[in-house]
Amino acid sequence: MQMTAEEKQTSAKIPAERSTCDIYIPPERKAIAGGGKPHVVARDFSIYYGEFEAVKKVNAEILSKYVTAIIGPSGCGKSTFLRAINRMNDLIPNCHTTGALMFDGEDIYGKFTDEVLLRKKIGMVFQKPNPFPKSIFDNIAYGPKLHGIKDKKKLSEIVEKSLRKAALWDEVSDRLDKNALGLSGGQQQRLCVARALAVEPEILLLDEPTSALDPKATAKIEDLIQELRGSYTIMIVTHNMQQASRVSDYTMFFYEGVLVEHAPTTQLFTRPKDSMTEDYITGRFS
């Protein structure tokens, strides 16, 4: 495939030693209508496990309807930060926070925050697919039922709509009554995405969603992220820098709990402002 003049100009800006990391740099993505407003805002936000500060005074704005990737070496705090956004860290003993983390202007850790409602608006998909040991239909209908929807026709509409959004409907429409545990790993992960979408969230958090999948299933998840881009704010933690460059509009780089750099993905991978970012993406440390 021949490079366009714009791509040649971009690649010319990458020093030879950095290009050896073989990262695909996509062209600038088009702006999203109605997107770009701060959806999640962190101000001096820290996360502690007991006295250990796992995430250190993060200041960042996550823009609505765009895809933000979070990269960094193991143990750098990226998953801890992601899980804080819908308060999954509350389940960990002695975990507490300081500073502010806001969602649509409301304090996520505020005294009167309804955690169930928060997790309805901010859905999450984990590293390992975790379908319930129920039918495919009941997996998707579980959330809507939990939030008060009982009408069977309405539930059927939600199930079909959610599975279509997750690009799974055509593969399972004739076996909705079958146990979801019988699906392949890639199908199970898309089922988990559909289950999150069924309650109509505004934000979708993906914690290394393809790390347990084969390349074919990974490609389907990446295609799904692009389909959902513009309809949801998506944040994805990944160890795969090529994946981050393929799917995201913005990238955050964490190291030892510190947000080192947060920039448009193309800029971060071709013109990083911090030498530590450059060292990481060129493979000088991992």
UniProtKB/Swiss-Prot annotation:
One of its GO terms (molecular function) is ATP binding. Residues 40-281 form the ABC transporter domain. The complex is composed of two ATP-binding proteins (PstB), two transmembrane proteins (PstC and PstA) and a solute-binding protein (PstS). Its EC number is 7.3.2.1. One of its GO terms (cellular component) is plasma membrane. It is found in: Cell inner membrane. NCBIfam families: 3a0107s01c2 (TIGR00972). This is Phosphate import ATP-binding protein PstB. It catalyses: phosphate(out) + ATP + H2O = ADP + 2 phosphate(in) + H(+). ATP binds at G72, P73, S74, G75, C76, G77, K78, S79. Belongs to the ABC transporter superfamily. Phosphate importer (TC 3.A.1.7) family. Part of the ABC transporter complex PstSACB involved in phosphate import. Responsible for energy coupling to the transport system. It is a peripheral membrane protein. GO terms for biological process: phosphate ion transmembrane transport. Keywords: ATP-binding, Cell inner membrane, Cell membrane, Membrane, Nucleotide-binding, Phosphate transport, Translocase, Transport.
